[in-house]
């Protein structure tokens, strides 16, 4: 497969052109860790294309990605899924859609709602032992769709824990009510490449975002915006310019270009190996003391979530034990620890983690049934009004009846 962005950068770096253009390092700098990177870092010069135009080497590379993912169109983001989410919601604003969203949305969604002055009608998941991860019921979604004309449903799947919603059934339900389904698939970039294609676009979503940098070999900030409904394709780049930097990173775009090659040539075999390694890890003696299964519709296989609470240990205490043994986790709180595998990880990674978990000794404490009751609060103001209002910081135990001014996750 061709790699138009990488090929151009490699050729230009060796061309001998005198660089009378940005960036200021001019393709060279004093000897440091980035000295081999600078020659590939350019701006929109002749023949380098433009991220926000529909021709040139970047557009050619995006077409490769679209073919690999099986979408109507795919666009690159150098601002992570955050930029994709801003763009998708702006497209819904153009379409005069009324936004319904599942409440465990990421802060990037709420920030985009602030910027676009979108008022949200919330669907609340059924939470078990964490407000980060919960099960959304089809009946609750349908109840909202019945009451909302020209609707858009926004849902996060997989969530931070790796738990996945039944996107196929949700897509069918949305389209029955002529609603648009938008999916934050930031944690699910690998989903098209398992034996069963579980990607939101394949399951009927109208658009979604994938954070390539989260689960694939791509630089931080690299993401894909996928379109399943071609009605929205023509406006994506125009809308994206409202939020994106006018100096997009060619290094990040190059990493997406090269990631496409990995996806086409290697990922399916690597994921087969990953699934085998994970299955062996979960069956190992080291995992007998830890609860790792998530009671959900499905779980993204590379998300390795330990329910510390049900394992009889405080999650932050377990996290400290891991760090002491040089394991850096993705996230930890009192009840859970999240660790992320990647298709890049080999057997040594899994063996090392298994050995560390096996070395951790603790006396499990007796746990009571941790059931979170999270009632739907009364709406007092819009998200934008709350974001720009005066606020004060108070202990969470004294926050009953108050308006939340910001989010943390």
Regions found by a protein language model. Name each.
Residues 286-408:
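Conserved C-terminal alpha-helix-loop-beta "cap" of PLP-dependent enzymes
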Residues 73-75, 210, 326-330:
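A short linear hydrophobic-aromatic micro-motif
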Residues 48, 75-77, 153-156, 338-340:
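Short glycine-rich or small-residue beta-strand-to-loop segments that form or flank ligand, phosphate
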Residues 1-56:
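N-terminal "arm"/small-domain region of PLP-dependent enzymes with the aminotransferase-like
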Residues 5-10, 32, 53, 68-71, ...:
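Conserved PLP-enzyme active-site core in the AAT-like
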Residues 27, 160, 214-215, 230-232, ...:
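Short, glycine-/Ser/Thr-/acidic-enriched flexible segments
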Residues 38-80, 104:
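Conserved N-terminal alpha-helix of the aminotransferase class I/II PLP-enzyme fold
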């Amino acid at each position: 497969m061709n790699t138009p962005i990488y090929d151009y950068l490699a050729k230009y770096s060796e061309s001998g052109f005198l660089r009378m253009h940005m960036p200021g390092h001019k393709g060279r700098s004093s000897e440091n860790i980035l000295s081999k990177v600078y020659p590939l870092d350019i701006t929109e010069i002749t023949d380098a294309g433009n991220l926000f135009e529909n021709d040139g080497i970047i557009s050619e590379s995006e077409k490769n990605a679209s073919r690999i993912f099986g979408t109507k169109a795919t666009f690159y983001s150098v601002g992570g899924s955050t930029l994709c989410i801003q763009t998708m919601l702006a497209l819904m604003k153009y379409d005069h859609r009324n936004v319904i969203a599942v409440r465990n949305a990421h802060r990037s969604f709420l920030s985009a709602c602030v910027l676009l002055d979108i008022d949200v009608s919330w669907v609340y998941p059924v939470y078990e032992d964490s407000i980060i991860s919960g099960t959304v019921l089809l009946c609750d979604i349908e109840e909202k769709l019945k009451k909302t004309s020209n609707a858009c449903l926004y849902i996060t799947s997989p969530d931070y824990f790796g738990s996945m919603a039944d996107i196929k059934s949700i897509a069918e339900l949305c389209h029955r009510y002529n609603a648009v389904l938008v999916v934050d698939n930031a944690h699910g970039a690998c989903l098209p490449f398992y034996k069963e294609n579980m990607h939101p676009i394949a399951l009927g979503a109208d658009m979604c975002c994938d954070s390539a940098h989260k689960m694939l070999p791509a630089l931080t900030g690299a993401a894909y915006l996928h379109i399943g409904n071609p009605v929205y394709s023509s406006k994506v780049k125009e809308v994206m310019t409202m939020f994106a930097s006018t100096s997009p990173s060619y290094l990040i775009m190059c990493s997406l270009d090269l990631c496409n090659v990995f996806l086409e040539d290697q990922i399916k075999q690597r994921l087969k190996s990953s699934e085998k390694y994970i299955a062996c890890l979960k069956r190992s003696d080291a995992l007998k003391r830890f609860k790792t299964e998530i009671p959900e519709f499905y779980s993204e296989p590379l998300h390795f979530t330990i329910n510390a609470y049900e394992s009889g240990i405080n999650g932050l205490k377990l996290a400290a034990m891991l760090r002491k043994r040089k394991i850096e986790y993705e996230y930890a709180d009192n009840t859970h620890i999240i660790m992320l595998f990647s298709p890049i990880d080999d057997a040594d990674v899994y063996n090392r983690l298994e050995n560390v978990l096996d070395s951790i000794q603790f006396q499990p404490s007796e746990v009571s049934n941790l059931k979170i009751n999270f009632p739907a609060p009364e709406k007092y103001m819009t998200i934008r009004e709350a974001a720009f209002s005066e606020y004060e910081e108070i202990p969470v135990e004294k926050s009953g009846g108050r308006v939340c001014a910001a989010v943390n996750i």
